[in-house]
């Protein structure tokens, strides 16, 4: 008996020795090519870069992996306990691998196999860190052995808190969320500090199968997994029985970011992205760096600008009538057929519908959801002039675009025309709003900053400003008559004409500007000289290399909406240099400011993401550099207010504000513009086709773009007081006769004269410059074609 016992002990000892030898050999064999785990000390995870409006509303997120890094000290204990209960009960007690857990899982999996249930794993949190950071997801014995070895080694070097920090920030939780902070935001629109026990348990349940645990698709399975985690928290002593019952009894309610917490500004965000990438000289750092970018964007103005632009483009498009239905489908199983119609680009809030029946005064339509409605003929009148019957416009089976309005629908179509709008603070250069097109999802081409177009009459402002800078008086008389300009040897002569082809005779320079008379502008330009006009175009940043030709003065140069709006911003602020900017400051993932537009001390810049809604950025003290003198600047501002009061911008008078502005229409009406400003704001807008073509023979800045400006200002500034433009000391206001330009006490217009010209005016009471010599001009009596 003793011999048998001794034999078995001997065999057992040999087996133990053999097992230890094999284990030692395996460890020795696989330890030679293990990945370097020291890199975990320098953990620098890809994090989300977020762009915010000036008032803290989230505009956009950019990332390769949507992650917000959170130090372990900032993670609530209840969230940590949820993960310990769900993933690794003995985390704080084992050396990286849980031998008891492995044995328990082995016996449990035998039962699971016999009952056809899912197998349970025994990987610890440390092992998952190793797999996520250092190894692949390959299912092999070799990978598992390496995982165990490294897990043990890591546990001897890293603290449990360090391992948890790696795990909680690296793990994927579904819906594009990496790390617990991103998961809390994506699923519950909360910070991790705000999570309830039930919500913490839900997040802790996700790593097992993040793609499958979707409450929208499999609520009961997700809730069962969450409740299992809650029960484990109770069993492990983290929560009380009452807390467990309350948490299990709560439903899973997912929450998206509230609309009031975000702002849609796709073109603006894309511009910011490009600028920051250029600033950092690294696309990688932008997408991985976890930057916080605060912009100049005003969320309310952005929304109003977008609405005004879309409304203006749609109204222009409707004035040109209904093109045609998208398709025609059979009415048998019409709902399925309608679902199979490809969704048109830029549908936005519009809907697809199919015409089910038509009568003289309405159309019956069906929508994708199976509901039915009607379109009265009054909501189709725009489609065709003198529309008498719907039957002449639509037929059964026609697929059309509609818009819900009150208790019915209206016929609509997606505009082919496009445009842009930009809003600036003229004193700081802050871009308060920028909409680069009708729909970013369809066209990412930014018509604010990228589209080079001819500004038409917008250039005239700077021709007149050049004249005022060089001493030409605002009541100078010029002749609105035929003119021919000899452009030099070998060059054809140039015979400009007015928009409508008529001549109005002699008038003051002011009246010529207000009425946007081409021939007056050409005469003013010839009096000043092209050299000075080229200089002012470059000085105001409209075009860096304008061609020195006379057609330039009528807007044949190319510029962007951003450049020309900024040029008018310089006028609006009194002639001081300003540059449009989108970005106020940038912070890295640790909250350190790496860029600030203004270098002065900013006491409210050291803020966390959660504090952004209360952050106030100081208005910067700009480097003052004069682009033009304040007297000439006020004179041209006076002209621009006149263009609103009695010129091409007359329609804007309905706003009841003191506004300066100028319309612009290029040759053949291919590009239309309006830029208007007050002492506080400048708004530029443009409308045209991406492939330039005529908008219509009667299309002008006045009837195409000005309505967009009016709509925006009517909503954005309706409650703002009407502020006058400041009159500088170098200007004296004198009443003159609008027609003759003579100074008379009861003059019909108040003219702005430079103080150093007053004596000259008093000595020359009758201002008459009819016979002023302008070299290079030959007046023609015949009509110009």
From Swiss-Prot:
Active site residues of this protein = 87 (proton donor), 457 (acyl-ester intermediate)
Transmembrane regions listed in the UniProt entry: 7-27
Q: Part of which pathway? A: Cell wall biogenesis; peptidoglycan biosynthesis
Region (Transpeptidase) spans which residues?
398-711
Name a Pfam family for this protein.
Transgly
A single GO CC term, please?
A: outer membrane-bounded periplasmic space
Q: Where in the cell?
A: Cell inner membrane
What InterPro entries would the database entry show?
Beta-lactam/transpept-like, Glyco_trans_51, Glycosyltr_51/Transpeptidase, Lysozyme-like_dom_sf, PBP_transglycosylase, PCB_OB, PCN-bd_Tpept
- Looking at the record, which segments are called Transglycosylase? 49-220
* Role played: Cell wall formation. Synthesis of cross-linked peptidoglycan from the lipid intermediates. The enzyme has a penicillin-insensitive transglycosylase N-terminal domain (formation of linear glycan strands) and a penicillin-sensitive transpeptidase C-terminal domain (cross-linking of the peptide subunits).
Name under which the protein is recorded: Penicillin-binding protein 1A
């Amino acid at each position: 008996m003793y011999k048998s016992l001794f034999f078995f002990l001997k065999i057992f000892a040999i087996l133990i020795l053999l097992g230890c030898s094999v284990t030692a050999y395996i460890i020795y064999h696989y330890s030679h090519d293990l990945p370097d785990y020291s890199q975990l000390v320098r953990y620098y995870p890809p994090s989300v870069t977020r762009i915010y409006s000036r008032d803290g509303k989230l505009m956009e997120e950019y990332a390769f992996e949507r992650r917000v890094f959170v130090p372990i000290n900032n993670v609530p204990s209840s969230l940590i306990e949820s993960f310990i209960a769900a993933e690794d009960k003995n985390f704080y007690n084992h050396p990286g691998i849980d031998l008891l857990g492995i044995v328990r899982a082995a016996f449990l999996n035998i039962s699971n196999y016999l009952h056809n249930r899912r197998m349970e794993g025994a990987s610890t949190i440390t092992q998952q860190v190793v797999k996520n950071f250092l190894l692949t997801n390959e299912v092999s014995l070799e990978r598992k052995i390496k995982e165990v070895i490294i897990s043990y080694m890591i546990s001897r070097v890293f603290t449990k808190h360090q391992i948890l920090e790696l795990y909680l920030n690296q793990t994927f939780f579904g819906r594009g969320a990496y790390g617990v902070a991103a998961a809390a935001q994506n699923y519950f629109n909360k910070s991790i500090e705000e999570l309830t026990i039930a919500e913490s348990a839900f997040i802790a349940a996700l790593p097992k199968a993040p793609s499958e645990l979707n409450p929208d698709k499999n609520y009961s399975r997700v809730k069962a997994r969450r409740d299992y985690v809650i029960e484990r928290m109770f069993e492990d002593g983290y929560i009380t029985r009452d807390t467990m019952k309350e948490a299990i009894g709560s439903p899973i309610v997912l929450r998206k970011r509230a609309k009031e917490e975000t702002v849609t500004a796709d073109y603006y965000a894309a511009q910011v992205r490009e600028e920051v990438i250029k600033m950092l000289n690294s696309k990688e750092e932008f997408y991985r760096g976890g930057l916080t970018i605060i912009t100049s964007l005003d969320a309310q103005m952005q929304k109003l600008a977008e609405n005004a632009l879309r409304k203006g483009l749609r109204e222009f498009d409707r004035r040109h009538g209904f093109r045609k239905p998208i398709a025609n489908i059979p009415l048998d199983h019409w709902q399925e057929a309608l679902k199979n119609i490809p969704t048109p680009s830029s549908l936005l809030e519009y809907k697809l519908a199919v015409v089910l029946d038509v009568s003289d005064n309405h159309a019956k339509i069906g929508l994708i959801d199976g509901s039915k409605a009607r379109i009265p003929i009054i909501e189709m009148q725009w489609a065709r002039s003198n529309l008498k019957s719907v039957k002449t416009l639509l037929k059964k089976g026609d697929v059309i675009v509609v818009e819900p309005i009150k208790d019915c629908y209206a016929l609509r179509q997606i505009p082919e025309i496009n445009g842009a709008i930009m809003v600036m603070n003229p004193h700081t250069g802050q871009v308060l709003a920028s909409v680069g097109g009708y729909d970013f999802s369809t066209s990412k081409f930014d018509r604010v900053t990228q589209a080079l177009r001819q500004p038409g009459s917008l250039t005239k402002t700077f021709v007149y400003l050049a004249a005022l800078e060089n001493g030409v008086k605002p009541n100078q008389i010029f002749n609105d008559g035929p003119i021919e300009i000899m452009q030099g040897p070998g060059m054809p002569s140039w015979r400009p004409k007015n928009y409508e082809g008529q001549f109005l005779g002699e008038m003051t320079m002011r009246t010529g500007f207000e009425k946007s008379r081409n021939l007056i502008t050409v005469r003013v330009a010839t009096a000043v000289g092209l050299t000075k006009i080229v200089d002012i175009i470059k000085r105001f940043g409209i075009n860096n290399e304008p061609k020195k030709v006379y057609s330039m003065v009528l807007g044949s140069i190319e510029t962007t909406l951003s450049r020309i709006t900024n040029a008018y911003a310089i006028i609006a602020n009194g002639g001081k240099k300003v540059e449009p900017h989108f970005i106020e400051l940038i912070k890295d993932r640790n909250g350190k400011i790496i860029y600030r537009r203004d270098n002065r001390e900013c006491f409210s810049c050291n803020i966390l993401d959660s504090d952004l809604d209360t952050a106030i950025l100081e208005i910067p003290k700009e480097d003052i550099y004069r682009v033009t003198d304040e007297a000439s600047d006020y004179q041209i501002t006076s002209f621009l207010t006149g263009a609103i009061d009695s010129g091409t911008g007359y329609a804007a008078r309905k706003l009841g504000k003191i506004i300066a502005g100028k319309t612009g229409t290029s040759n053949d009406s291919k590009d239309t513009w309006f830029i208007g400003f007050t002492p506080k704001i400048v708004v530029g807008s443009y409308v045209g086709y991406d492939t330039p073509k005529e908008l219509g023979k009667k299309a002008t800045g006045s009837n195409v773009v000005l309505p967009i400006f009016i709509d925006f200002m009517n909503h954005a500034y309706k409650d703002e007081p009407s502020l006058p433009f400041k009159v500088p000391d170098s200007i004296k206001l004198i009443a003159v006769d609008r027609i003759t330009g003579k100074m008379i006490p009861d003059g019909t217009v108040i003219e702005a004269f430079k103080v150093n010209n007053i004596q000259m005016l008093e000595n020359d009471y009758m201002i008459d410059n009819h016979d002023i010599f302008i070299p290079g001009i030959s007046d023609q009596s015949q009509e110009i074609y």
